[in-house]
UniProtKB/Swiss-Prot annotation:
The keyword Cytoplasm applies. Zn(2+) binds at residues 124, 128, 134. The gene is ybeY. It comes from the Bacteria. GO terms for biological process: rRNA processing. It comes from Caldanaerobacter subterraneus subsp. tengcongensis (strain DSM 15242 / JCM 11007 / NBRC 100824 / MB4). Binds 1 zinc ion. The keyword Hydrolase applies. Its EC number is 3.1.-.-. It holds the Pfam family YbeY. This is Endoribonuclease YbeY. Single strand-specific metallo-endoribonuclease involved in late-stage 70S ribosome quality control and in maturation of the 3' terminus of the 16S rRNA. It is found in: Cytoplasm.
Length: 158
């Protein structure tokens, strides 16, 4: 597993978050029984930067907490022919962009730690990269159950 982390903001102290994000990504992959080597890029930004990205990619002119950019349908990895796969091959599955500024605001609003919020946003985004969504009530419920299992695995229950 390769995790590339880029702190592109200066408003919130990101000390110690790299290890937490890597743990959250690893726990999500383990919970989903992903055995392939994957690469994930994570960027920490502020509210203004994520607002610009949200407007450009989703047409929504407001800040948000996290954006997920899958690079492939995860089924493409699972359906590849086993004998054609190089054991050393690493699959880049996507990019995660987290507004640390928004994460800090939400942690205060929800009454839990900043670290728990960043871990949750990472898990939520990883599930999107793995093909989950929350467009329907059924999808939302399934995704929430998955999030809770991973957060429990991390010891970060509500």
């Amino acid at each position: 597993m390769n995790v590339l982390i880029d702190n592109r903001q200066t408003k919130v102290d990101a000390s110690g978050l790299e290890a937490l994000v890597v743990r959250a990504i690893k726990a999500t992959l383990e919970e989903e029984e992903v055995v392939d080597e994957v690469e994930v890029s994570v960027s920490f930004v502020d509210n203004e930067e994520i607002r610009k990205l949200n407007k450009y990619y989703r047409g929504i002119d407001s800040s948000t907490d996290v954006l997920s950019f899958p690079l492939m349908e995860f089924e493409e990895i699972e359906e590849g022919e086993e004998d054609e796969k190089d054991a050393e091959e690493i699959y880049p599955i996507g990019d995660i962009v987290i507004s640390l500024e928004k994460a800090k605001e939400q942690a205060e609003e929800y009454g839990h730690s900043f670290e728990r919020e960043v871990a949750y946003l990472t898990v939520h985004s990883m599930l999107h990269l793995l093909g989950y969504d929350h467009e329907t009530e059924e999808e939302r419920k399934l995704m929430r159950e998955k999030e809770e299992k991973v957060m429990e695995r991390l010891g970060l229950r509500r």
